[in-house]
Amino acid sequence: MNEKELKEMIAGILTEMVADNQAVSTATVTAEEKPVTTHVTETTEIEEGLIPDITEVDLRKQLLLKNAVDPEALLKMKAFSPARLGVGRAGTRYMTSSTLRFRADHAAAQDAVFSDVSEDLVKEMNFISTKTICNSKDEYLTRPDYGRQFDEENSEIIRKNTTPKAKIQMVVGDGLSSAAIEANIKEVLPAIKQGLNMYNLDFDNVVFVKYCRVPAMDKIGEITDADVVCLLVGERPGLVTAESMSAYIAYKPTVGMPEARRTVISNIHKGGTPAVEAGAYIAEIIKKMLDKKKSGIDLKEAE
């Protein structure tokens, strides 16, 4: 059913409702009252427009408790957390607005997981496009081990398009949130480059990995023999945000190394650590790793 047919159906239903009401009424409709029926019919036309996006509303500034004892104190408390605090109830049920927002945020999280990073973005950023041995998103989700491995073809693409034994190798992976990459990568990469330039450091070609798990950076480290590998990857989305990105950084990563050798900077998004601020901090961490020749817990202990 198209939009025109839907409008005609609604108009017909409303017209029948008006006719039924007139039949039940015992009052005689006079000539002066006839325009009322015309008026009702005219208002049945559906207006064109866009429904506001409820996900754009800042939950920290939204007051849903109509009879709050101290509204100002409630808003002050909500300002410190994006959690759903003071959502209000209608009897034993959530308010309609709270329920719709919950469903919208859940849908956004699902979209972030099951969608792919735009190929146009990969081309625009001049990334070296590669993929792990996963053949589909379903396989990526059900076989995490496949998201850590590259076939010979993609290994060769990485080998030919990166600088051997570079000080820094940057990697971007879709991870569990393509939305996180699309929302943050254009800001965080220039910030990292600018921060590194202050230490007379830089990086060359950036590798993009489709169907990427964090340990994929270990294989890239072995292929390139880079001193430091930094992976920017989409975090598992939740109801607070679907655009959160993390940076996993390691000194001389190798396949099968302990997770404790990674340094992680998480919660990179507009509602957490801003991308520009995170970029500057990532550059600082990379410089420390190159100086100390350590990462993860070892770097922490060496500071």
UniProtKB/Swiss-Prot annotation:
Family assignment from sequence similarity: Belongs to the EutC family.
Necessary cofactors: adenosylcob(III)alamin
Pfam families from the UniProt entry: EutC
Alphabetized HAMAP family for the sequence: EutC (MF_00601)
Annotated GO CC locations: ethanolamine ammonia-lyase complex; ethanolamine degradation polyhedral organelle
One annotated GO biological process: amino acid metabolic process
Source species, domain of life: Bacteria
Binding partners and assembly: The basic unit is a heterodimer which dimerizes to form tetramers. The heterotetramers trimerize; 6 large subunits form a core ring with 6 small subunits projecting outwards.
Role description: Catalyzes the deamination of various vicinal amino-alcohols to oxo compounds. Allows this organism to utilize ethanolamine as the sole source of nitrogen and carbon in the presence of external vitamin B12.
Cofactor binding mode and count: Binds between the large and small subunits.
Keyword hit for Lyase: yes
Catalysed reactions, semicolon-separated: ethanolamine = acetaldehyde + NH4(+)
The keyword DNA damage belongs to this UniProt entry's keyword annotation: no
Binding site for adenosylcob(III)alamin: 214, 235
Subcellular location: Bacterial microcompartment
Pathway: Amine and polyamine degradation; ethanolamine degradation
Annotated source species: Enterococcus faecalis (strain ATCC 700802 / V583)
Enzyme nomenclature, EC number: 4.3.1.7
Major subcellular site: other
Keyword vocabulary terms for this entry: Bacterial microcompartment, Cobalamin, Cobalt, Lyase
Protein name: Ethanolamine ammonia-lyase small subunit
Molecular function via GO: cobalamin binding; ethanolamine ammonia-lyase activity
Organism classification: Bacteria, Bacillati, Bacillota, Bacilli, Lactobacillales
